[in-house]
Amino acid sequence: MSIQYTTVGDLKVGNYVVIDGEPCRVVEISKAKTGKHGSAKANIVAIGLFTGQKRTLMAPVDQQVEVPIIEKHIGQILADKGDTITIMDMENYETFDIEKPTDADIVDKIRPGAEVEYWEIMGRKKIVRVK
């Protein structure tokens, strides 16, 4: 798995974090200083990149969290198989199947021969946009 570590206090809106084994994009952060002897806590709300599910993380700001390393690639659509799409990577010409995205803007532009940008995150692949 391609991950690195950072502290909860260093996270900002728009960053990526792993919550419950799922890579997520941070959409909201609120920090609260507790009492005289307590350390500050952060409440992080994030949306899963693959599931779209809302996830929350409540942790001290000095706690280490996993941050996924996102590898961005360009590929060409070879075939639309209904639920999956066959893509060929433009750098190493490897072919593989990716689950069809649910975003209507992307689905409308999918056609054989079109170039797509896809992300590889923690061993999983996702189409982000069609060029």
UniProtKB/Swiss-Prot annotation:
Keywords: Cytoplasm, Hypusine, Initiation factor, Protein biosynthesis. GO terms for biological process: positive regulation of translational elongation; positive regulation of translational termination. One of its GO terms (molecular function) is RNA binding. Disulfide bonds: none annotated. The modification Hypusine is found at residue 36. It is found in: Cytoplasm. One of its GO terms (cellular component) is cytoplasm. InterPro entries: IF5A-like (IPR001884), IF5A-like_N (IPR048670), NA-bd_OB-fold (IPR012340), Rib_uL2_dom2 (IPR014722), Trans_elong_IF5A_hypusine_site (IPR019769), Transl_elong_IF5A_arc (IPR022847), Transl_elong_IF5A_C (IPR020189), Translation_prot_SH3-like_sf (IPR008991). Pfam families: eIF-5a (PF01287), IF5A-like_N (PF21485). HAMAP family: eIF_5A (MF_00085). Functions by promoting the formation of the first peptide bond. Belongs to the eIF-5A family. PANTHER family: TRANSLATION INITIATION FACTOR 5A FAMILY MEMBER (PTHR11673). This is Translation initiation factor 5A. It comes from Sulfurisphaera tokodaii (strain DSM 16993 / JCM 10545 / NBRC 100140 / 7) (Sulfolobus tokodaii). The gene is eif5a.
